[in-house]
């Protein structure tokens, strides 16, 4: 398996939204309760201006995406970014998330970011374990603030200083 990272571009619109919509429909990893149309890709590209954002490819097939975005748009927060990544469900557990995290950490340093935040559903135990294993620590928890599929759950905030 040959993994590569390609800057997010228009050609990635459909596979990226399809991957995200899979998680909307089948998990608590993505918070919306209804899938998005392909125009949602424009929101991703708007939110990632000035930050690294990639389609993840395996042998020319898009198998995920990852990006950093502003935690807060105020200039006083410029050293803090929020991380997002979704890997196609049939590629989970193959080290791709680790590659994506390392790539984004390296790029974060290059754009002056030294704190990365992740917010994760309390029902997504695999993601929580992944982040803790990779140097994140829990820094906050909002209890029962979201309801999806008739289940209320917490949002856990994790932080990594790089």
Regions found by a protein language model. Give the residues of each.
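Conserved catalytic-core motifs of GNAT/GCN5-like acyltransferases
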Residues: 117-120, 137-154
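A short beta-loop-alpha structural element at the N-terminal edge
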Residues: 2-16
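Glycine-rich acetyl-CoA-binding "A-motif" of GNAT/NAT acetyltransferases
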Residues: 61-64, 126, 152
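Conserved beta-strand-loop-alpha-helix junction that forms the acyl-donor binding cleft
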Residues: 118-128
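Conserved acetyl-CoA-binding loop-helix of GNAT-fold acetyltransferases
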Residues: 93-108, 129-133
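Conserved GNAT-fold acetyl-CoA-binding loop/helix
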Residues: 17-44
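Conserved GNAT acetyl-CoA-binding A-motif
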Residues: 108-120
């Amino acid at each position: 398996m040959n993994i590569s990272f390609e800057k997010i571009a228009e050609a990635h619109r459909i596979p990226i939204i399809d991957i995200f919509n899979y998680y909307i429909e089948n998990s608590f990893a993505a918070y919306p309760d209804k899938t998005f149309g392909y125009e949602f890709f424009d929101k991703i590209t708007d939110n990632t201006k000035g930050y690294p954002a990639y389609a993840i490819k395996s042998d020319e097939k898009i198998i995920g995406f990852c990006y950093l975005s502003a935690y807060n748009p105020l200039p006083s927060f410029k050293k803090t970014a929020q991380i997002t990544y979704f890997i196609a469900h049939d590629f989970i557990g193959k080290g791709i998330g680790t590659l994506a995290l390392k790539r984004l950490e390296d790029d974060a340093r290059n754009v002056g970011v030294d704190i990365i935040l992740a917010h994760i559903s309390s029902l997504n135990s695999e993601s929580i374990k992944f982040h803790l294993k990779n140097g994140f620590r829990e820094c906050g928890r909002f209890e029962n603030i979201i309801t999806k599929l008739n289940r209320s759950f917490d949002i856990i905030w994790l932080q990594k200083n790089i």
